[in-house]
Structures are given as structure tokens and as C-alpha cells.
Amino acid sequence: MQIGNLSVENPLFLAPMAGVTDWAFRTVCARLGAGVTVTEMVSSRALVYKDQKTAKLLRKNEGSLCGAQIFGNDPEIMAQGARLALEISGCDFLDINMGCPMPKIANSGDGSGLMRTPELAQKIVEAVVKAVNVPVTVKCRLGWDKGSINGLEFTKRMEDAGAAMVTVHGRTRSQLYSGVADWDMIRKVKAQLSIPVIANGDITGPEAALRCAKWTGADGLMIGRSCFGDPWVFQQVKAAMAGEEIPQRPVLKDRIAVAVEQFQLAEQDHGEHVACLEARKHFAWYLRGVSHSGFYKQQISSLTTMEDIYRVAKEISRDLQ
């Protein structure tokens, strides 16, 4: 698959997710089979105003292609922000967020709010394409709500504006993450565009991935919430798509070792305090579905040092299966 002049050998994408896909987690997912990662979304305006905290979110991971994702609704600010994002990160492509459904983003006209103003969205893509020398991609939804589904028209505008690829989450903004993703609509988007289309939504594992790929004809798949605490889903989906035997998830002890490695990377990136805050969230996800893990989840909720992490990890590996 090609994203503009960028060759993609493994079109299995890790979705950009605020508060989740930091450098540490992207690094782990890339090692375990994600072919393309995207940073957490960053504000174009914050980049222009030289906010250092925002800039730190753009660290490029190794082991996969990596895109920098920005959001905003002013074409000129977005163009400036795009240039800065690439200067800071050295990422392989620039992704524009037109899919975030969170109220503080969407109600400000950013993220999925741009699906209510398709002409402005088109101007933003045109401005960003002119401003940067890497492929520009767009992530969007089906529309604002059930009564205003405009995904077909919207994605055609993105292509006309110069987008090199679109990723479509098969839900409207008003659905947030509820209901069932509409793969049929993604199929229709794929049928009308000549640029690559990536399917996103309800790709929960290898079986769902095969069904989605077959039904939509999408050029690639993007996995989001299904990888929380389970980065091995990329390994499994990659094998399924290649027609190979699907590997089993590692035993708990080995999964915990990967979790600890992730938190060590987070410490390198953010320092101990932030790494422990991230660990409280991610560690609990790594224990989803593990019997008798409630006691340890309570301990995880109050982690404050890396030594706490090592101690709890050792106890879990000893006591649980």
C-alpha cells in the first residue's frame, strides 16, 4: 500500500488515542506487529504558541511508520502547526483529526466537529498539504449524527483537497463508541475513492479483522480500544491477514513483563511520576479478564514509584495465572 510516496508493508494501524498512545505504548505495539502508529492528537494552536508539554507528545517511535496527528479548525494555524509538528517529530506523515467525538473538542468545531463544516475541512487539508512535504492523511467518522451522515461527500472532499489517505471510524460523532460500527458505509467510501481507505471500529481481534477486511475491501485496518492491555492483538491480526496460524497470547507472567517494560519506557519519556500515573491505567488493562485480580487492581490504583510497579508485578506473576 502507498500513502502518497510512502510505502506501507504492513497496513495494520494503531489508532491515535489521547492519554493512551504515548511513545512507550506505541513502541510496544510496533514491536508486537503494528505496522503504522500515530501520535496522540496535539493542538495546532498549542504548537504555534510553543507549548512544550504539547510538543513532548510528538516523540516518534521506532519499529513502525509513525504519523503526527494534529487538530484545530483554522487553516492557517493548522498549516503552521503541521510544519512545526514535523520539525519537532520527524514523523513520516501528518494526520489531521476530524474524528474525535469528545465534547470539548467537537463542540469547539475541532475533531468530528469539522464534519459539520465540510468546506472548512477541505480548506484545512488544502492548506496543510501546501505547507508540508510529507503525505497528509485524515481520520474522520460517518458524520455528526444519524440525521447528518455525510461520510461519502466528506471523504471525497478530502481526496479532492489532496489527502493521501483517509481513515474512517464506522460511527457518527453522536454515537461516541456505542452501538455497532457501520462497515457497510466504509465499504461505500472505499468504492468511491482512489486513495487508500483504512477501516476503523469494532476490529476486536483476528476474526473480526478478517471479516472487516473482506466486507469493506479497505486497504488497511486500524485497531483502537481492543489493544488496551493487549498489544498482542496486532501480532494475532497480522498473522490472520497473512493466512498464518494465529499465535496465542503469552501467559500472564510474560504479559506482565511486557507491561513493566512499557512502564520503564514511560519513565524514560516522562519521568517516574507521570510513568506511575500511566501505569495505574495501563496495568489495570493488562489484568482485564484475569481471575482474582481485584486485590492487585486496588494496589495498582495507588502506584507512586517504579519500585511499587516492580513489587506489584512480582506479586502478580507469583500469585495469579
Regions found by a protein language model. Name each.
Residues 115:
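Aromatic- and acidic-residue-enriched carbohydrate-binding clefts of CAZyme catalytic domains
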